[in-house]
């Protein structure tokens, strides 16, 4: 699966979020342009950890440069933890036979009470649309499903419980066609994820 290349707007959003992430944070990164933009903006950070459901190509530069070293995590310190990988051959080759990377089942990785054990969890996700009541739709456009239900809710909950944790749902305000992604109410049939 090729990595989503961030747009200009997504890069600006990613830069804003990166400014809010402290050194020593433990990251959970969703999939898509904005999460990749956040990762690209973290190259000057230190001692980041990674405890995430989906591992993508976007983490490779931070792992290879040592920005992600997992040294300050409380859950499996020194080790990157994920449940699945979505990426290129480069990602899979990097992951092959690594002692500093553990793939766990999703029930273990996405347990909010395990997630919260790490300090400063930064849960960074995106959405299809949000509404003014705070509902988040991340996996459908109306009734049309575009992805499976993932661990966004688990990480938003665990991140909020984490000491010094922060959670982010980041979206451009409009679609490429100029339609608002922020609605009074979600599109009828839209699945509420968070």
Specify the residue positions occupied by each region the protein language model found:
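Conserved phosphate- and dinucleotide-binding cores of soluble alpha/beta proteins
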Residues: 1-194
């Amino acid at each position: 699966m090729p990595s989503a290349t961030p747009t200009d707007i997504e890069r600006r959003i990613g830069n804003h979020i990166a400014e809010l992430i402290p050194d020593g944070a433990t990251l959970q990164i969703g999939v898509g342009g904005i999460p990749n933009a956040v990762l690209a903006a973290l190259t000057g950070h230190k001692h980041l950890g990674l405890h995430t459901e989906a591992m993508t190509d976007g983490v490779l530069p931070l792992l290879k440069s040592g920005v992600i070293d997992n040294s300050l995590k409380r859950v499996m310190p020194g080790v990157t933890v994920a449940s699945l990988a979505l990426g290129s051959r480069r990602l899979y080759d990097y992951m092959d036979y690594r002692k500093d990377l553990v793939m766990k089942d999703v029930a273990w990785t996405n347990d909010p009470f395990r997630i919260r054990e790490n300090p400063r969890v930064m849960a960074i996700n995106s959405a299809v649309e949000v509404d003014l009541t705070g509902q988040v739709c991340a996996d459908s456009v109306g009734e049309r499903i575009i992805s499976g239900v993932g661990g966004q809710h688990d990480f938003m909950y665990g991140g909020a419980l984490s000491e010094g944790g922060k959670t982010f749902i980041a979206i451009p305000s409009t679609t490429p066609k100029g339609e608002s992604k922020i609605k009074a109410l979600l599109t009828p049939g839209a699945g509420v994820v968070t």
